[in-house]
Amino acid sequence: MARKRTSKNDPLRMYLNYVRKLQTMGDAYDESAKYRIANFENGFKSLHMVENEFKQYLANVIDEAIKSGASPQDLPYVNEIKLALMKIFTSWLKYSNEKLGANEIAINVAGTATMTLTENLYGTRVSCEEAVSLINSIFAVWVGVEPFEAEEREGACLVTPRSPLPPVPISSPTGFSAPIQEVLQAKSPEEIIGVKGGA
């Protein structure tokens, strides 16, 4: 006598269940895709806004440092390397956003500074030591450390870290600052403006 096939082992039923699961998985993936795209767009907008605010704040910090005498004496030749400084400090934003530790941030920013200053100081009246002194003075104002030392060798401006460099604090019109991770996790521009991190 043939053994009766149970519904649990019925190949047709098993196949239909499998197809149903595939369809459900596809629907779930499509649904989650909406959230993934929305999160990507929101994250991109937040990062773009933070970069713009960061660059504006950086420009203000550099200008204030220059006016207060924390930079080389000759204002015109400091302006000659302003774009190079912007590139170095923007790399600080990049490495902060990668959630690196303070030591790794210092090492990576020092590498960017070495390449950028070696390329951009040629033909200016700014020495390697003066440029790094200016960078340190800005970091001292911003995060309370002077992380780099400089050595000019065979035309290259070698920048090496001497202390850890904390992640970027983002300024806000409220007068507070916050780590970039907190800023990017905010759900709206209002939260970014109002977020309270460090003083």
From Swiss-Prot:
User: What is the predominant subcellular site recorded for this chain?
Assistant: virion
Q: Which UniProt keywords apply?
A: DNA-binding, Virion
Q: Which domain of life is it from?
A: Viruses
Identify one Gene Ontology CC term for this UniProt entry: helical viral capsid
Q: Which residues form a coiled coil?
A: none
Q: Where in the cell is it found?
A: Virion
Q: What does this protein do?
A: Self-assembles to form a helical, filamentous nucleocapsid. Together with capsid protein 1, wraps arounds the DNA and maintains it in an A-form. Capsid proteins probably maintain the DNA in A-form by non-specific desolvation and specific coordination of the DNA phosphate groups by positively charged residues. This certainly protects the viral DNA under conditions such as the extreme desiccation of its host.
Under the subunit heading, UniProt states: Heterodimer composed of major capsid protein VP4 and major capsid protein VP5.
What's the entry's take on its domains? The N-terminus projects into a DNA groove.
Q: Could you tell me what this protein is called?
A: Major capsid protein VP5
- Please report the organism this UniProt entry assigns to the protein: Sulfolobus filamentous virus 1 (SFV1)
